[in-house]
A protein has these predicted regions:
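Surface-exposed aromatic
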Residues: 23-31
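Short, charged, amphipathic alpha-helices and their helix-cap/turn boundaries
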Residues: 2-21
Length: 232
């Protein structure tokens, strides 16, 4: 189990959860040992996990029925927003003595995907719904970068990933896109494009260049020499 917690911590750091430490896989207090995190880190984790189709299916399931020869079992998801709020697509409830009621939820409307996290909140379901209603009204999804051609000082440059963000109109106006060129562009990567808002970086992607391979035309004697080399 210690090894699994080690892997969990490595993954957490890999997705930017810099204020999180896991000591076990359950998330529960274990004597003097305690898992700790922040609402921001939990939002990063949930936003990352919801992109996994199996995870999304599990956390978005309202109830599941299992029949055996002896009995039928029905389990209900404790995330009440799945039933009471039409835009909710998943989430996870929790409780510990120190953190009290914890709730992580995800919601999606008109292409805008949001995550809300609360700790020690006795009105968590109501607060989550209120926050979603507030920000769905002011946020729009913008495609910041599109996979394919990108304008640089070189011809035939492109990126291999698209990038979208949910922003207010004011945030969109303040968004910065910066192209950084590498000194050595002998490879097919000539630099990177960086997207930031209020000095915080949100996305970085390598910029590639399509280098044309020119066909070398051989004269009659060069063709003979080439053929002799191939035979030997």
């Amino acid at each position: 189990m210690d090894n699994f917690a080690y892997l969990m911590n490595n993954k957490a750091k890999g997705i930017g959860m810099n204020n999180t430490t896991f000591v076990n896989s359950s998330g529960l207090e274990d004597g003097d040992k305690a898992n700790y995190s922040t609402v921001y880190d939990m939002a990063l984790l949930s936003g990352y996990a919801i992109n996994n189709s199996l995870y999304k299916q599990i956390v978005g399931t309202k109830e599941i029925t299992v029949k055996t020869d002896l009995k039928t079992y029905v389990w209900h998801n404790k995330n009440k927003l799945l039933s009471s709020y039409k835009y909710c697509v998943g989430g996870k409830t929790g409780f510990t003595e120190k953190a009290r009621r914890t709730l992580v939820t995800n919601a999606s409307s008109d292409g805008v995907n949001l995550t809300v996290v609360t700790f020690n909140d006795g009105n968590d379901f109501g607060d989550h719904k209120d926050l979603y209603e507030k920000y769905f009204d002011v946020l729009n999804e913008y495609e910041i970068l599109s996979e394919g051609p990108i304008k640089t000082k070189y011809d035939n440059t492109y990126i291999s990933r698209s990038f979208k963000m949910s922003l207010t109109k004011d945030e969109y106006k303040k968004l910065k896109k910066e192209i950084i060129y590498y000194d050595d562009n002998a490879s097919n990567i000539i630099g990177k494009v960086k997207v930031s808002l209020n000095d915080k970086e949100y996305f970085t992607e390598d910029i590639y260049i399509k280098k044309e391979v020119k066909e070398v035309k051989l004269n009659f004697f060069q063709k003979i020499i080439k053929r002799i080399k191939e035979l030997w």
